[in-house]
Amino acid sequence: IGAASLAVDNELASAPDSPAVLVERDAILSSVNFDTTELALTFEAAGLALSHLAATSAARIMKLMSPASSDLPRFLTRHGGTHAGFATSQKTAAALEAEIRHLALPLGAMTLPVADGVEDYAPMTPAIVEKTRAIALRMTRLAAIELVVAAQAVD
C-alpha cells in the first residue's frame, strides 16, 4: 500500500506532457511522464499481495470450523448433527477468495499498440487501479467474515 501511495504521489506531482513545452524557459523537452508503468505495477503488486492475504484468511475460516484443526464444534455450532452453524459463510468466503484470486491476475502485460500504432505501449493503469479497488472491497468483506467466525469461535 505504501508503494502504491508513493507511486500516486509521484504521478500527481508530474506533468504527463510529451513533449513538455516550457514557455518560461523557451524549451521543448521530451519526457516519459506519460508512461504510468510504475503506477500500474505498484497496484498490480498490491492486488497480488491482497490475494495472498485472502487465501490465508479463507484458510483460517475453514480451519476454525473444522474440529480436526481447531478442537471446536463443526461449523461452530454446539448443536451438531444437521445444524449448519456457520457453514454457509464458508461458501461466501470461498467465492470471495476465488474472485480476489481471479482479479489479481496481472493485466498490465496484456497490451496492444494504441493510437493507430503511434503509441506502442499502454500499461492499462486505469483498469489495474479499478481491479485493485474491487479486490480491496472484496477483501474487506472476507475480513468481516473472518472476524465474525473468529468471534463465534471465541464465544
Per-region residue spans from a language model:
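Accessory "access/gating" subregions that flank catalytic or transport cores
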Residues: 1-55
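C-terminal catalytic subdomain
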Residues: 37-155
